[in-house]
Amino acid sequence: QEVDVIAAVGALDAGVQNMMDKAESRPGEKTIIDALVPGVEVLRGGAARAAGNAEAERALLRDAAAAAAAGSEATRQMEAVHGRAAYSAERSIGVLDGGSVVGRLIFAGIASAPAETRPER
């Protein structure tokens, strides 16, 4: 069964939006959102052009993983707004957010999944 890339990206985007709404969190607040949003933005921006082309889809996934990694790394310069780290927000500057690492790993895992784990075209 073929995966509808545009629908999959839409579902991922909706999921991240739901997370932001439920957690009352936005990018720049030193959370998993700081990795997820850049990855989803790359996917949203390239899904239509890559759809149906396995090579272009793989490249798009790699680009999304790179964007998520950059978003995660950017949390080092942010002050924590949520969770226990927010109690000593100034001390959180210079420390990588653990949640953002999870977001980075999600995108890295998707991008590095062997092609044979995906449906045949």
Walk through the language-model features, giving the residues of each.
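N-terminal loops that bind phosphate or other acidic moieties
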Residues: 1-121
